[in-house]
């Protein structure tokens, strides 16, 4: 009798009910540009210097020294739009997802049920995984509310052996050595 090896994974309600995303395109808004313009007519012929400069650069003036992009819009749709041209070519991605603290902000609800939050994060991290080079890294800022669930989700997508570390950073100096309670003034960067 042969058994299929099992792997450790995080499960939650709705995990496998992910919407199918169709390919997207990015459209530049000159009002929001920072001086370098992508030529919309050369779609598919560009490659960011982040990815090694393999394709022709459509940056006006031939400046290929710009290695970053700022994309305004829904992050899942933006990631999907990048997937076609940049799969396997991004060296470093940094995301700052909602911490799921229970607060309401102008642009998003930060008090989601854990399963809903994980269902929102999973497709984003899966696309980022496809975008990263073999030696690429993903840096995620997060707090205690979801950090440990997020770490396990990343282990599932990237493989546990690809976890580099968790950086703890203190965002407030209110804690003291003689405090009678635990300090809650820190966040994490999961790499």
Residue ranges and their predicted role:
Residues 81-82, 149-153, 177-178:
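A short acidic (Asp/Glu
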Residues 2-4, 130, 180-183:
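A general structural signal for short secondary-structure junctions and capping/turn motifs
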Residues 114-168:
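Conserved Class I SAM-dependent methyltransferase catalytic core
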């Amino acid at each position: 009798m042969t058994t299929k090896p099992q792997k450790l994974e995080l499960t939650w309600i709705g995990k496998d009910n992910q919407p199918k995303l169709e390919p997207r395109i990015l459209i530049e808004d000159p009002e929001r540009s920072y001086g370098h313009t992508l030529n919309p007519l050369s779609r598919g012929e560009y490659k960011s210097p982040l990815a090694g400069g393999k394709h022709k650069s459509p940056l006006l003036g031939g400046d290929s020294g710009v290695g970053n992009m700022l994309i305004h819009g829904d992050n899942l749709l933006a990631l999907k739009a990048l997937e076609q041209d940049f799969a396997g070519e991004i060296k470093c991605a940094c995301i700052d997802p909602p911490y799921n603290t229970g607060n309401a902000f102008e642009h998003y609800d930060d008090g989601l049920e854990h399963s809903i939050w994980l269902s929102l994060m999973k497709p984003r991290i899966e696309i980022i995984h496809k975008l990263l080079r073999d030696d690429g890294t993903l840096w995620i800022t997060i707090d205690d509310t979801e950090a440990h669930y997020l770490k396990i989700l990343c282990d599932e997508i990237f493989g546990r052996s690809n976890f580099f570390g968790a950086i703890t950073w203190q965002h407030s100096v209110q804690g003291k050595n003689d405090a009678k309670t635990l300090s809650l003034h820190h966040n994490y960067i999961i790499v």
